[in-house]
Regions:
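Structural recognition of the conserved hydrophobic beta-strand(s) that form the central parallel beta-sheet
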Residues: 72, 332-339
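Nucleotide-state sensing region of NTPase/ATPase domains
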Residues: 48-135, 144-147, 151, 210-214, ...
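Active-site residues of response regulator receiver
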Residues: 307
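A conserved P-loop NTPase coupling/switch region
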Residues: 110-118, 122-189, 193, 362, ...
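Conserved NTPase motor "head" modules and their coupling/switch loops across ABC/AAA+ ATPases, GTPases
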Residues: 1-31, 175-304, 312, 316, ...
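Conserved lysine of the Walker
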Residues: 36
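Post-Walker A helix-loop "phosphate-sensing" segment adjacent to the P-loop in P-loop NTPases
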Residues: 44-57, 294-301
Length: 367
């Protein structure tokens, strides 16, 4: 999967840009706030039909403008005349966005997810450690959805049923004795069906993903530290349908569903201790990088976006990361940095297959 060309109009601070890319390494250098991250976000948008940072589409349109457009020309690497395809999105204030493959609009955006596998590494990844379990579930969901479209369908159905059950709990919160048992059971039976699929897919993913993650961490840290990542779910210990019935009285009191796969967690450890508690900034950054680079290995050379990845890392880890991402194990890479030295070190390893852009106030000049 290669992004050959990208055209942008009125996306955030990028008023107009037409760029052609290298198959391997594409570097963007410039001060903070100039548009480097916005460029990566536009590429992300074409994979996931939304921004990585702001899901309110109208707020991603350049201020004072009424519409924005992102268009990418992709090489799917297939031995046919249709290997090159255009993916485009049009955003207009007050109007539903149009997402198109070639000349055909998608009826449902979910149909596009997984077509263009992509992994993004950004400073926002720190929320995987610092924030609640919903961030870690979102990580699992984001990876699995790229190779299993049924997973995303099950997840959407489960969340819709969860919303229904929570609304019903709220409705009878003050009069729990009047709660309609049969209606609850109808909803819960359907929730269990979707929850089991999600649970088994998450279990399978973590089992297959962890070796790649640990390999990447060892490469970054110099094999000096041991890390682990464990999937924790209530379904590992109990029958969910029985749990729904047993906890329904308590759920009616609190007004929300206390059991289910929406409570799943990832236990992130450095040695025998929680990463959040004992990990230094550099160790936490290395752990997150290993998760994302492991994801790239797991998905099989997706487009890889690396935004400001060297911050908070010592010189030795920076050197190991440069060697790692410059290797043949990764596909097309887009990387940003304010420090030209880091990018120069990468370019020295891949000089013939790299392009570099200077980014200034939303404009991109090839170097």
């Amino acid at each position: 999967m290669i992004l050959r060309e990208l055209n942008i109009l009125n996306y955030k601070n990028i008023r107009e840009a037409s760029l052609r890319f290298s198959d391997k390494l594409n570097c963007f250098v410039g001060l903070n706030g100039q548009g480097k991250t916005n460029l990566l976000d536009a590429i992300y948008y074409l994979s996931f039909t939304k921004s990585a940072y702001n899901t309110v589409d109208s707020q991603n349109i350049t201020h004072t403008e009424e519409m924005a457009m992102i268009q990418g020309l992709y090489d799917f690497g297939e031995p046919s005349s249709d290997a090159l395809e255009t993916i485009s999105c049009g955003i207009k204030r007050g109007v539903k966005k149009q997402f198109r493959r070639g000349k055909k609009d998608y009826k449902r955006l979910i149909e596009h997810i997984g077509l263009i596998p992509l992994v993004m590494v950004s400073p926002q990844d720190s929320e995987l450690i610092s924030e609640g379990s919903d961030e870690r579930r979102r990580f699992m969901d984001g990876v699995i959805s790229q190779y299993d479209r049924s997973y995303l369908e099950h997840l959407m159905q489960y969340n819709a049923l969860l919303k229904q059950r929570n609304a019903l709990l709220k409705q009878y919160e003050e009069h729990p004795s009047q709660a309609p048992t049969e209606l609850f059971e109808v909803i819960e039976i359907q929730m269990v069906e979707h929850a089991l699929y999600i649970y088994y897919q998450r279990t399978d993913f973590i089992q297959r993903f962890v070796p790649a993650f640990q390999e990447m961490y060892a490469a970054i840290s110099g094999e000096s530290e041991q890390v682990s990542l464990q999937y924790i779910s209530q379904l590992q210990e109990r029958d969910l349908q029985e749990a729904f019935a047993r906890t329904r009285p308590r759920d009616l009191i609190v007004g929300w569903t206390t059991q289910g796969i929406h409570k799943d967690e990832l236990d992130m450890r450095l040695g025998d201790y929680p990463l959040k508690r004992v990990g230094s900034q550099g160790q936490q950054k290395s752990y997150l990088l290993a998760m994302k680079l492991g994801q790239a290995i797991f998905l099989g050379k997706p487009i890889l976006l690396l935004d400001d990845i060297f911050d908070k890392l010592d010189a030795e880890r920076v050197e190991r990361i440069i060697q790692l991402v410059s290797s043949h194990r990764f596909g097309q890479i887009f990387i940003t940095d304010t420090d030209r030295q880091h990018l120069t070190a990468m370019l020295d390893k891949t000089p013939s297959i790299a392009t570099t852009f200077q980014v200034t106030n939303g404009q991109f000049n090839a170097l």
